[in-house]
């Protein structure tokens, strides 16, 4: 799996430039954006959502039940009573 570092090396730019292009931030010339996008495509780079959430101090609940099903719930996606149900599910599967 390609990393941000791999994309930066291939495009000949810094990791912060790659990040700015991926996050569609200002301050990057169009020619540089094209080089980075080409490198992303060549490497098959896919941003890591978990890492992004950690950086943004966002969190989620991930639970695997007895059948192997995985439940992923992003913070703020549930009401208080629903959180209680998720906690109960966790307790049942410990």
Swiss-Prot record:
> Which keywords does this chain's UniProt record carry?
DNA-binding, Repressor, Transcription, Transcription regulation
Looking up InterPro entries in the UniProt record yields: HTH_LacI, Lambda_DNA-bd_dom_sf, YtfJ_HI0045
Give the protein's biological function: Repressor for the scr operon. Binds D-fructose as an inducer.
Q: Which residues cross the membrane?
A: none
Please name the Pfam families in this protein's record.
Answer: LacI, YtfJ_HI0045
Q: What's the name of the protein? A: Sucrose operon repressor
Disulphide bond pairs: none
- Tell me the DNA-binding residue spans: 4-23
Is this entry keyworded Thylakoid? no
Keyword Nucleotide-binding on this protein? no
Write down the SMART domains for this protein, in alphabetical order.
HTH_LACI (SM00354)
Its taxonomic path starts at:
Bacteria, Pseudomonadati, Pseudomonadota, Gammaproteobacteria, Vibrionales
- Reading the lineage from the top rank, the first entry is Bacteria
Q: The HTH lacI-type domain covers which part of the protein?
A: 1-56
Q: Which gene encodes it?
A: scrR
- Which Gene Ontology MF annotations are present? DNA-binding transcription factor activity; transcription cis-regulatory region binding
């Amino acid at each position: 799996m390609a990393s941000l570092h791999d994309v930066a090396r291939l495009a000949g730019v810094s990791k912060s430039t790659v990040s700015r292009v991926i996050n569609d931030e200002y301050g990057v010339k169009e020619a540089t954006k094209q080089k980075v996008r080409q490198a992303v495509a060549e490497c098959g780079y896919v941003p890591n959502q978990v890492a992004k959430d950690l950086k943004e101090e966002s969190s989620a609940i991930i639970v695997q039940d007895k059948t192997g099903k995985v439940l992923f719930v992003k913070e703020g996606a549930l009401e208080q009573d629903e959180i209680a149900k998720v906690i109960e599910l966790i307790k049942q599967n410990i």
